[in-house]
From Swiss-Prot:
This is Imidazole glycerol phosphate synthase subunit HisF. Its main location: cytoplasm. It is found in: Cytoplasm. It is an enzyme of class 4 (lyase). Pathway: Amino-acid biosynthesis; L-histidine biosynthesis; L-histidine from 5-phospho-alpha-D-ribose 1-diphosphate: step 5/9. IGPS catalyzes the conversion of PRFAR and glutamine to IGP, AICAR and glutamate. The HisF subunit catalyzes the cyclization activity that produces IGP and AICAR from PRFAR using the ammonia provided by the HisH subunit. It comes from Actinobacillus pleuropneumoniae serotype 7 (strain AP76). One of its GO terms (biological process) is L-histidine biosynthetic process.
Length: 257
């Protein structure tokens, strides 16, 4: 059985790490490189960097910090933000990224997933999905351009359909960003994760809602996700990664320590 992964997420805007609540009202957390180094030293299994306004601004990831991060950490890291072409991805891999993640550009052109998977291998291609639960209808919708609240739009894709579509096209991993839960720290949406897990045959990473150690345990044991991604609880030292891993190990979760 593969060890479960603990993944700090760093949302990047204008060269700094920021964090919002439900993808809005972002506050500055600090500089990218020292934070990345800290997480690697504290025992993170992997890091994810989202250049959150790249897609909505119509540009690709600001590459200047990617190379600097690669120089100071020795764990895998994934980069996302406005990657629309093979060339965009090639540059990020050349600077040291281990994986790239696409989200809004995949919705704009689903063939991009296949092109990237064919060129770099499925193991290097992650698809991020921003889901929104519509209480009135009980449906989960996929949103696009969520890095800019003025441009965020609901697509015509329902969540489970899109999860199946991206797998057919070559996604090697899915990060599910559950927008209703984002930054509110009251737990991952286990109902949603279980629904996605039933149709997801590639590694599934939960994102949005972690506030306590038990939330990580529940995502792993109840929804059988492969990794749990979190931001504010790590940025604000509400949870220390080393302590979290000891707790999960004691709770019977297969984890790298």
């Amino acid at each position: 059985m593969l060890a479960k992964r603990i993944i700090p997420c760093l949302d990047v805007r204008d060269g700094q790490v920021v964090k919002g609540v439900q993808f809005r009202n972002h506050e500055i957390i600090g500089d990218i490189v020292p934070l990345a180094k800290r997480y690697a030293e504290e025992g993170a299994d992997e890091l994810v960097f989202y250049d959150i306004t790249a897609s909505s601004d119509g540009r690709t990831v600001d590459k200047s910090w990617v190379e600097r991060v690669a120089q100071v950490i020795d764990i895998p890291f994934c980069v996302a933000g406005g990657i629309k072409t093979i060339e965009d991805a090639e540059k990020l891999f050349a600077f040291g990224a281990d994986k790239i993640s696409i989200n809004s550009p995949a919705l704009a052109d689903p063939n991009l997933i296949t092109a990237l998977a064919d060129r770099f291998g499925v193991q290097a291609v992650v698809v991020g999905i921003d889901s929104w639960f519509e209480k009135e209808t009980g449906k989960y919708w996929v949103n696009q351009y969520t890095g800019d609240e003025k441009r965020t739009r609901q697509t015509n894709w329902q969540l489970l359909d899109w999860v199946q579509e991206v797998q057919k096209r070559g996604a090697g991993e899915i990060v599910l960003n559950m927008m209703n839960q984002d930054g509110v720290r009251n737990g991952y949406d286990l109902t949603q994760l279980k629904l996605v897990r039933e149709v997801c045959n590639v590694p599934l990473i939960a994102s949005g809602g972690a506030g306590e150690m038990v939330h990580f345990r529940d995502a792993f044991t109840q929804a059988n996700v492969d990794g749990a991604l979190a931001a504010s609880v790590f940025h604000k030292r509400i949870i220390e990664i080393g302590e979290l891993k000891e707790y999960l190990y004691a709770e019977g979760v297969e984890i790298r320590r």
